[in-house]
Amino acid sequence: MAGSSRIGFMAIAVAFHLVYILSIFDIYFVSPIVTGMKLFGVERPHESPKAPADRLVLFVGDGLRADKAFQAHPEPYPESDQDLVPRHLAPYLRSRVLEHGTFGVSHTRVPTESRPGHVALIAGLYEDVSAVATGWKMNPVNFDSVFNRSRHTWSWGSPDILPMFQHGAVPGRVDAFAYGAELEDFSKDATELDYWVFDHVKDFFAAAATNETLNTALREDKVVFFLHLLGLDTTGHSYRPYSKEYLHNIKVVDQGVKEIVELIERFYGDDRTAFVFTADHGMSDWGSHGDGHPNNTRTPLISWGSGVAAPELHPGSIAPGHDELSSDWNLDHVRRHDVAQADVAALMSYLIGTEFPANGVGQLPLNFLSASIKEKAEASLANAQVILEQYRVKEENKRNVELRYQPYGQLSDGNLDPESRISHIRSLIEAGSFEEAIEESDALMSIGLQGLRYLQTYDWLFLRALITIGYLGWMAYATTTVLSLYVVKESMSPQRTLLGSAFFLSLLVALYSSFIISKSPPAYYLYAFFPVLFWEEVYARRANVAKGFQALFGHVKSGGAVVALVFNVVLYLGVIQSLALAYIHREILTGLFVLGAFWPMTQGISFLRSHLFLSMLWFFSCLAMSTFTLLPAMKVEDIPLIMAGGGLMTFVGLAYLVLEDFILSDVSSSKTKLKRLHTSRTLLGIQVGLIILAMLVTHSSATSLQAKLGLPKGNQIVGWFVLVTSLLMPLAYRLQPNSHYMHRLAIIFLTCAPTFVILTISYEGLFYVAFSITLLSWVRLEYAVDAFTQEKAKKQATVAGSQQHTPSTFRPLSLSDARIALFFMVLLQSAFFSTGNIASISSFSLESVSRLIPVFDPFSQGALLILKIIIPFFLISANLGVLNKRLGVAPSAIFMVVLTASDVLTLYFFWVVKDEGSWLEIGSTITHFAIASFLCVFVAALEFVSAAFIAGIEVEDTKSAALTSASTKADEKVPPVAGAE
């Protein structure tokens, strides 16, 4: 098998994890969209054929939180003491709530991003979570929507939102007027985006006065106007939702809505227009969105105009619907009607009299309607028919591909089938039992939605079992490979039997046959292939497994040794479990670093005396690392902290320049030193200079952006120059190569330092320095411990005939190497979580990338974010590569052990994924699984990065090389104590 080699194993590891990451899409992210449904709308009597409204205007304040829309705040830009008195910043919208319409909170689902939010509002369905990846660029909404059902829709706003509804609708039905992407400049005043929309709407209606064709089209019924207002989202990202800029933007939106409403009412003069104001998602206090935090999922919903109910007032008392959220809105006497975001699409369809969107799952909010109880009953029935029609089509599709289909119980019995229920509701309406009909329709919608979920999750049990067996098989296979390559001295060939091969082949054929009959997706075949492959390989190499365990545990015979082994196993499993919990509670890493700081003390007083400085450096670097996970993960721009981090990087670089001869003196000849003074030191000085230049340009750019002066072009050019030049600097060292590992690590540190200055917004630069020092002290300390242990063992050895190992061979892995793998795992997790968490990564602050790319460009900005995230991982890979070489361990050995152990985390997160509960819990558990899976892939990639970083380095001084070549010990090369530091 290919996996029996190092390269083959890594290739299989990457392929397996990439394929199994896709399993999350086949389990949790299956698209709910089906085609072939009949359309349903409210059937109106011939004597009153008109819908409640002839036209509808939809305002979407992108990124507007519910609380900020209704709370009172001081004037954002006060000009007098009176302006400091809190007042409501959206008085016009507030007047709609108090006097003209119905209001509430629209609750979104995760991901709280623009595309999923607009799809829920306009199409009435919740796209699978993976749809967020398609929301940044034009991807048509290839399913039904309110716009598609309308006679015509005109829309104004962002080029990231409008085209996807235009291209996904019937050709010619939706007109989109979008500004250029260059206007989405995070360094400029984002209210210009909203002014652009309002001004172009005004120009549009003005043109209708002289354009007869346009005027005629505007006066048709079933017309929709969509105004997408992006200013609030852009301002929130740049300045946070509690900033004066965000609050001022609310005033701009409120005034603009007022002017557009008055314009439309003057143009038509018939009071036949309905208005809906809402948002696609909210905004966290840190200027981010994407996760399921309540600040992101709660958005305002205000509707007024033709067909909309007047406010339900309760003078002198607290009206129903209010809770702690709305306690400071001063709207306690007005009933609050909360809805799910998809319900808004059903509301809009009803108001203009179109069919409900075919894929809609929203439930019509009857409290928003100014209609008779009979009309509400008929509308509710039509709403239920939409959902049941989707169930019918989905069930038919599933029944056609399943050998033994099990229908959903509540919709399968003869007396309870959908057709019978609908007939019963119709009879209730005809009998005048409207309230009962509404209740039955609500119950039927609820059952229909449950049935849709049943079909959506029909294959979950089988897939979860298959994926679990696959991960267990991978871990067993990886363990077998590690034992064969790096523990067993003479690996045996696979021992396959005819019966065993027939069993595994029959199992694979049976699974594939079921997939063919069920018309399963192609990925299912790979999900089944890997576990069969892995377990067959483990079975074939069972002899190597037995020999490997004997080599590792054969010496554990005494009771004390068994107790020590059990204690270490429990301890290591506890640390791994702690790493899993650290995904949720970053503070756990603080505890692990504090515990790790005392590790040298476990080696005894003699070791501490010999390596006091190194032990103290490790102790204080661990304590420094422990502080970062106590700091806020969601950060705001802090220029002094950025400068402090850059200053520390500069200090480290200058210190190395001054002490370079002392650090490298044991491997360098006088001739080499002289050359280094003229070449290497010059390059080191340039790298330090780039850090200083990065600090200067970052300070200037950040100050200019904070003052809303935009990003100076010169700063942008210099910033890119520093970023690119610093990353290319290692190539210049080919002029005078220096193979000492300390010199190589110093180059890598200085190479990445300017990037961390330019792309940091707070304490990340300080973390970079502390993390680098921790890694270096870890490498030297592990080598010192290994040398100390081997020297001690050599003195106590009673067997003289030990097997010889030359410096050119790799020693086998031992149980003590599990500690190295465990430290590597902790450092790997801290590289990600010390400066952030899931939410801070998914919705990162724009201050850093706007210093290089001020205009909205998600892929380029995302690439810069990824660069910043992966730099600490590069540092880890380089240091582990050095450590492997110093210890005489094969380059891939520790990486492969970590790759195996990391999947304990992956499988744990797979098991705890939730599909019920709050959307924050659901989204977080899915994200945890995805990140754990990608980290496993990343570990495999880091092995090759490490090989590139440490190519040609020297890790031993001349004295230690001589000693090492003469040392002997069974199964291990014995490094000398001298040079351990």
Swiss-Prot record:
One of its GO terms (molecular function) is mannose-ethanolamine phosphotransferase activity. Its EC number is 2.-.-.-. Residues 1-6, 486-496, 541-560, 609-611, 660-681, 730-744, 841-862, 914-929 are cytoplasmic. It comes from the Eukaryota. The keyword DNA repair does not apply. Glycans are attached at N148, N211, N295. Keywords: Cell wall biogenesis/degradation, Endoplasmic reticulum, Glycoprotein, GPI-anchor biosynthesis, Membrane, Transferase, Transmembrane, Transmembrane helix. It is an enzyme of class 2 (transferase). One of its GO terms (cellular component) is endoplasmic reticulum membrane. It is a multi-pass membrane protein. Residues 28-464, 518-519, 582-587, 633-638, 703-708, 768-819, 884-892, 951-981 are lumenal. The keyword Transferase applies. GO terms for biological process: cell wall organization; GPI anchor biosynthetic process. Belongs to the PIGG/PIGN/PIGO family. PIGN subfamily. Ethanolamine phosphate transferase involved in glycosylphosphatidylinositol-anchor biosynthesis. Transfers ethanolamine phosphate to the first alpha-1,4-linked mannose of the glycosylphosphatidylinositol precursor of GPI-anchor. This is GPI ethanolamine phosphate transferase 1.
